[in-house]
Amino acid sequence: MIIPWQELDADTLNNLLEHFVLQEGTEYGEHDVSLADKVADVRTQLQQGLAVIVYSELHESVNIVPKATLDRAQVDDIPE
């Protein structure tokens, strides 16, 4: 289930973004990037519709995924 980021409380969204960034350990190359900048990058991706927040009832977990990945997964689930 997709959770619209706009419907989350600002503190909840920020905590989710920080948790995601810390969990992912995204590599930014040779340059050190601050936690605030990483959070801002993911927030921008949400605002631009490039990423979405997904809740899994099965795993009772929340994740942030690229929208393109989600679109491909939905197409793959369509029976032929």
Swiss-Prot record:
Domain of life: Bacteria
Transmembrane segments: none
Pfam families: UPF0270 (PF06794)
Family indicated by similarity: Belongs to the UPF0270 family.
Descriptive protein name: UPF0270 protein AHA_0994
Organism: Aeromonas hydrophila subsp. hydrophila (strain ATCC 7966 / DSM 30187 / BCRC 13018 / CCUG 14551 / JCM 1027 / KCTC 2358 / NCIMB 9240 / NCTC 8049)
